[in-house]
Every structure is written in C-alpha cells, then in structure tokens.
C-alpha cells in the first residue's frame, strides 16, 4: 500500500501550505498531494476551495484574483498561500500528486508541467474534461480521475481514455470496485483514510490500493515500523 500525504499533512499543519507539504514529505510518505486553482493571470496556486474563505477568511475566488493579490493574503494562522511553483521547489525531488480544481485545463498548468517534466508528478481531477484534454496534450503524464458519486461511470471513462487510475472517497469503496480495478489494471486511490484500524484493514485485505491521509506519519509508522 502506498501512502500519500493529503494536502501535505492536513492533520498536522495548515493544509496546502509550504509548512504542511514539508511535514508530509518528512513523514516518509510515498507521495505528497496538494490542490491547485489557476489565478486570473494564469498562475497555479494552492487552495482546495474555489474561494479563500476557509483558508484566509476572504470570500474572493482564486480565478477572480491576480497572483499579486493572492500573495498578500495570509491563512488564518498567518501563513502564505504558495504558488504551485513554490510548492514544487519546496518539495525537491519528493513525488507529487497535483489535484487540479479548475473548470478547464489552463495554460498555467501545462506550462508548470512542461517546466517540471522530469519530476515525478501525477495529476488528478474530478473534472474529467480537464483530464481528457490533458491526455491529448500531454499523454506521458500519469493521470487519475476523481469521483464523488459515480465510480462505475468513472471506471468506464478511465478505460475509454486509457488513463492510469481513479481516486475515490473511501465510503464508496467496495470489493466489486476493487476487483474491477484489479482486473483492468486501474490504480485505485482512496481518500481520506485516517483511522489506524482502517489503514491496517485496507492494507491487509486490499493491498493494491493507495491512501490519502491527513496523518502520513501515523500511516508510515503503522505499516512500516519493525514489528
């Protein structure tokens, strides 16, 4: 089982900040995940929601703001909102999972991926139009289709587009989905798995899955510490 630090290490530090990403990387996780939106002037920045209310108490939306405006914001606990470029620099050679939240595939995302084409970056999104477009334009990139409600439809989309895998809310996971993914060699990523018993159960019964967790240090200790 592979362990992905969710939004860096969301349970240990403010999500999608440089501080959180560094904790996720230091935990020993196999990959560190963060979310990106593209600004009005084409710069991908880290944020989960469309606006900054949750992070910074600001109701303005990412795509309505310039990067210069966003650089002035601070999270509720005083941290900076990083650009995706800053995030990749901070993570060094740590493998990355970049969740694209935009409504379309922006030039800023393509430019970022091209600049870092030698990095181990996987791209995921719940917006399947973005993924189909990315598959056409950058076919070598490892792509994952996210879904909130429709895993069967998403698996058919994955097979049709010949992309790598699916990210799924763990509550929708079941043995049928596992066997389908195993049969068709579809990577399966589950989020967000935090409880120790759940991590150990999935590792024992469904070892092919990977998990996003807010506590990557905990998951690494549970699964990889000497018995």
Regions found by a protein language model. Name each.
Residues 1-227:
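Phosphate-group recognition and catalysis centered on beta-loop-alpha active-site segments
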